[in-house]
Regions:
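Active-site HxH/HxHxD metal-binding segment of metal-dependent hydrolases
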Residues: 1-41
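Short histidine/acidic/glycine/proline-rich micro-motifs that form metal-
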Residues: 18, 25, 126-127, 185-189
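A glycine-rich helix N-cap at a beta->alpha junction
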Residues: 37-51
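Localized chelating/binding microdomains
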Residues: 9, 185, 193
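Conserved residues at the C-terminal ends of beta-strands
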Residues: 21, 145, 183, 213
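Short, charged/polar "capping" segments at the starts of alpha-helices
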Residues: 24-29, 151, 189-192
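Metal-dependent phosphodiesterase/nuclease catalytic metal-binding core
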Residues: 49-182, 191-207
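Canonical P-loop GTPase G-domain recognition
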Residues: 207, 212-214
Length: 214
């Protein structure tokens, strides 16, 4: 985050919008200001926007973000990004182009708005909010933490409120994501252990969906 802000500031680019949990906004602002003073003896320009779980954020003409509630020792949220499109209403699917044009000319609304999930990202969490948004399971790409992977670390996952590999295995049949990107893996594991342990828990078809960000 400091690199993102400082590079825009030094290049004279207008500050980007940074969405952060409302509970942590003040602390994040303090940290950024102190790093800024250390870096250039001045204050960077940035824009922090507080969000709450279940907020809907319109951040481009055709993109919206839903704030997903997560469970962690401190406030943590995830984001589901959806593309907004207009599609022809089902009742007009059998009409010709000229018929649809005539309806539009007469003032009939022939389209409706739909939202198509594109990517979901989960921050630090001990739960996966599958029931908090109906499109989460449909997201083509799901990026999730998976801090602990070995059986002996199940209690540690509970104590620190992070996800264990067992929970990822459990939700795989419920999600349609083509890419399930696992990240935030504990540094206690070496690369070989991570790859062998994780891929051994999934079927061949699910292995093709799993991507590791080590």
């Amino acid at each position: 985050l400091p690199i993102y802000i400082s590079q825009r500031w030094m290049a004279g680019i207008s500050p980007g919008k940074i969405f952060v949990p409302a509970d942590g906004l003040h602390q994040i602002s303090q940290i950024l200001d102190q790093i800024s003073k250390l870096d250039c003896n001045s204050l960077w320009t940035y824009e922090l926007i507080p969000v709450q779980p279940n907020d809907r954020i319109e951040f481009r003409n055709n993109l919206v973000a839903y704030v997903l509630p997560l469970t962690h020792r401190v406030t943590s949220v995830g984001y589901l990004i959806c593309e907004v499109r207009k599609k022809l209403k089902p009742e007009f699917h059998t009409l010709s182009g000229s018929e649809i044009a005539a309806l539009k000319k007469s003032g009939v609304t022939v389209t409706h708005q739909v939202e198509l999930p594109k990517v979901a990202y989960l921050g630090d969490t001990s739960t996966i909010p599958m029931n908090d948004h109906p499109l989460l399971a449909e997201s083509p790409t799901l990026i999730s933490e998976c801090t602990f992977i070995l059986p002996e670390d199940r209690k540690k996952a509970v104590d620190t409120m992070h996800l264990h590999l067992d929970q990822i295995v459990e939700i795989m049949p419920k999600i349609k994501s083509r890419n399930v990107v696992l990240t935030h893996l504990s540094r206690r594991y070496d690369t070989a252990t991570i790859q062998q342990t994780i891929f051994s828990r999934f079927s061949r078809s699910d292995q093709e969906r799993i991507k590791l960000l080590i």
